[in-house]
Amino acid sequence: MLRNGNEGMSTIPGFSQIQFEGFCRFINQGLAEELEKFPTIKDPDHEIAFQLFAKGYQLLEPSIKERNAVYESLTYSSELYVSARLIFGFDVQKETISIGNIPIMNSLGTFIINGIYRIVINQILLSPGIYYRSELDHKGISIYTGTIISDWGGRSELAIDKKERIWARVSRKQKISILVLSSAMGSNLREILDNVSYPEIFLSFPNAKEKKRIESKEKAILEFYQQFACVGGDLVFSESLCEELQKKFFQQKCELGRVGRRNMNRRLNLDIPQNNTFLLPRDVLAATDHLIGMKFGTGILDDDDMNHLKNKRIRSVADLLQDQFGLALGRLQHAVQKTIRRVFIRQSKPTPQTLVTPTSTSILLITTYETFFGTYPLAQVFDQTNPLTQTVHGRKVSCLGPGGLTGRTASFRSRDIHPSHYGRICPIDTSEGINVGLTGSLAIHARIDHWWGSIESPFYEISEKAKEKKERQVVYLSPNRDEYYMIAAGNSLSLNQGIQEEQVVPARYRQEFLTIAWEQIHVRSIFPFQYFSIGGSLIPFIEHNDANRALMSSNMQRQAVPLSRSEKCIVGTGLERQTALDSRVSVIAQREGKIISSDSHKILLSSSGKTISIPLVAHRRSNKNTCMHQKPRVPRGKSIKKGQILAEGAATVGGELALGKNVLVAYMPWEGYNFEDAVLISERLVYEDIYTSFHIRKYEIQTDTTSQGSAEKITKQIPHLEEHLLRNLDRNGVVRLGSWVETGDILVGKLTPQIASESSYIAEAGLLRAIFGLEVSTSKETSLKLPIGGRGRVIDVKWIQRDPFDIMVRVYILQKREIKVGDKVAGRHGNKGIISKILPRQDMPYLQDGAPVDMVFNPLGVPSRMNVGQIFESSLGLAGDLLKKHYRIAPFDERYEQEASRKLVFSELYEASKQTKNPWVFEPEYPGKSRIFDGRTGDPFEQPVLIGKSYILKLIHQVDEKIHGRSTGPYSLVTQQPVRGRAKQGGQRIGEMEVWALEGFGVAHILQEILTYKSDHLIARQEILNATIWGKRMPNHEDPPESFRVLVRELRSLALELNHFLVSEKNFQVNREDV
């Protein structure tokens, strides 16, 4: 139990702090721990000894800037220098040498690997140690097992069979007697019997033959090896046999690590020192003792809850990077050994630096890390859709990945919410689909103890001293500590001092929820939001929503696109400011001073006699193709303080998160256009750029050298292409900045040389060569063309040339996208929908003051979904809009009084009605609703309608990126079927369901044509167009279509031969033909 330094004070920790703390632990401790494990490398004759030292290592400043690393597709890394010693004969050399580069974390808590922002997700795994469980077999007999989990994730099981014999199951197939295992680990029979509580059970099952096998350690090891490796015959004890056992079994299944040793000691009441990180015979015997106690009723029947957080540990960025560093050092060791052998062959004098500087050795470190970031499932591309995603991504915890669960095999129980999650892992925020419950998000106050890997949550201590002094101390409890405390829920208020004794409060104790007297409480929650993640904490009136809809909302807020003109919400929760601040999309003043000048690229600040240039991000592409842009917010000559906002990023206003827009909504059906969650919108949202967003797409092309050795060329001189397609190219063949480009336009002109044979030259080419001696170009045009849906303005062109023949050109195109039919919009309560129709503003329903509504939602989407929070939000938003107020409401306001949310909303509506002198704003007969009029006829609607100002987001699922059609396109070379997918211009025209529809109408000839001649009959599909145009008869080919050939080949692969016969109509003669 840890106390916080500031007694009685509790602030929300920095949301990116977890990533920074993890990386700092890796740099300060992880590197040293791995360097200490690096062995002294000696040659066989012991003439050379090479050693690295853990003390005094240094990391240099990165040689390139972060922005250049992104543009030039490089890795943002720092060079690591380590002290090394080389003994060569009698000569001893000490030197600080460079062993390679290590990726460095930037200010966002991410890494830049090959120009791409990547982040490492925290993994949550079963902690190493021992876990007991009992289960009934098919006959109803209780089976008791103890599972030992190593630090590597290897598992071994201890079990008692029907004959009361004790076995250790070291793999799925092999089980070994517990006596053989203990003896192989170094104990003799006398030591075993002296160290167990039930020696009679151990003595009951070995017969004379088995006792002989464990007479000595060598015999026990041979017996263990025979059973483990399933090897027969007479084996001879040897060092290589021991090394193989050490590598295959003991290292993988018996290394507990620091955390495993602590858990083993705690579970079995042992006092083995913490530095003993391997499984000892004493551990195995104590574990067996406990199992016997469970079986024969002398012990406590306590199954371990594998889903309790006390039995889990977090593998943070520190652990994963440290593992990779250890792996790289192992490779470095092998490389140095090879170099030493070469030294003897060449008979040259080595130095510490020359042993590690050959090209392959010096890049070992960085290539290991690049492979890790590129292939490891928890090293993900950083989600930069909006500031919220940037903050939330680093706080995710995942049960997936190496050593963890998989989406297909995880049980319901492992996905479920556990009482130990409260205040640590958000019960709401998880992914939808196959990984539901397997990826979660840390609660906003949770922190990770990086030493033990546990998640801690803060509480106020309610001790007698604290009560007397009237002060509160903040304590952080780990999951295995809070079981011993009575914890009052955070949504209960402090009690009235006078009647404390009589009052009872809801509390949590040992995973149960109770109602107990106030004086029995030990600690209480510090904040109503304490249980939720950032996504859940941004939902106003979350307590009025169904949990499934809150889950959808926290996921959809991460998909919101930054709009061209951001607007902060009228109704919020108060967490918007810190979320925006910790995303680091805004520029914050690091010192006080005076603004000299500001423009869209930089701000010049004068501070303490120095002029500081602060660069701004101008229209930079994010990983999700959204536009990142910073707008200066301080005029020239203004004095600023430290911590003040100098420039705002995308989707922030006034330092607060601003993902959507406050729009006037009505909940009513409208001619069926909002059936099944569809949304009707006004054209005002299009013409006034309310929901207009900017997107930046990147297109790149690279030159290469062909197999004949000739280089590709970037040029404007491309034969056989229309001038219209080349209109935007400059003299180098690259598109000009500021050009407007359409689908199919050439962005970069490129020619690939081809070798043509003499016979393939046309006659004119021979003539030109004979008369003028000119060679005709046989280059192939391989230019970069703008694909479908890519039209826009060229805002940047990057020309990266690593050598004369290796050139990469990147073109960035900015697109302006207004909201349109097919785009997805959503509120903050899981109320999502697709735009079905854009109405002229004069046709939209209008209020009694003549204001037309902006959006019409379906009211049937509320009762069944039980997300009533949207109703409170829209009504309070209307009041706030009329009163020019903004509200920041904490959840669970019913702790103040019953119906507190409704009372607040109605009182504000009444106040707005009074101040604006609009009685329709609050009508007592139907509060929150109002009579509104049909814009087409001017008649009032039959029923009063709920109207309000809701905060609605535009999501990244946009119709421009999804709509697709195909008339003709590419076919698969193998099956001759149309290819799949929008990216390949594919699309199967007639599928299974279309065939059913045609069968239903009995159109046999159309069906035959569509499935054969017009689809995949190679010759017929060429001829059929001609026949259709000239009105000829359809060709009737006797050979089968390609789909039939594919079927035949698939049957052949199953060893089934399908023969194809043609039967003559005249004489029924059978002619066999090969398919």
From Swiss-Prot:
Keyword Transcription: yes
Enzyme class: transferase
Gene Ontology MF terms: DNA binding; DNA-directed RNA polymerase activity; ribonucleoside binding
Entry keyword set: Chloroplast, DNA-directed RNA polymerase, Nucleotidyltransferase, Plastid, Transcription, Transferase
Localization, UniProt: Plastid, Chloroplast
PROSITE patterns noted in UniProt: RNA_POL_BETA
Catalytic activity field: RNA(n) + a ribonucleoside 5'-triphosphate = RNA(n+1) + diphosphate
GO-annotated biological processes: DNA-templated transcription
Main location: plastid
Transferase found in the keyword field: yes
GO CC terms in record: chloroplast; DNA-directed RNA polymerase complex; mitochondrion
Any single Pfam family the record assigns to this protein: RNA_pol_Rpb2_2
EC number in record: 2.7.7.6
Record-linked PANTHER family: DNA-DIRECTED RNA POLYMERASE I SUBUNIT 2
Family, similarity comment: Belongs to the RNA polymerase beta chain family.
Quaternary structure (record): In plastids the minimal PEP RNA polymerase catalytic core is composed of four subunits: alpha, beta, beta', and beta''. When a (nuclear-encoded) sigma factor is associated with the core the holoenzyme is formed, which can initiate transcription.
Function text: DNA-dependent RNA polymerase catalyzes the transcription of DNA into RNA using the four ribonucleoside triphosphates as substrates.
Protein name: DNA-directed RNA polymerase subunit beta
Source species of the chain: Zea mays
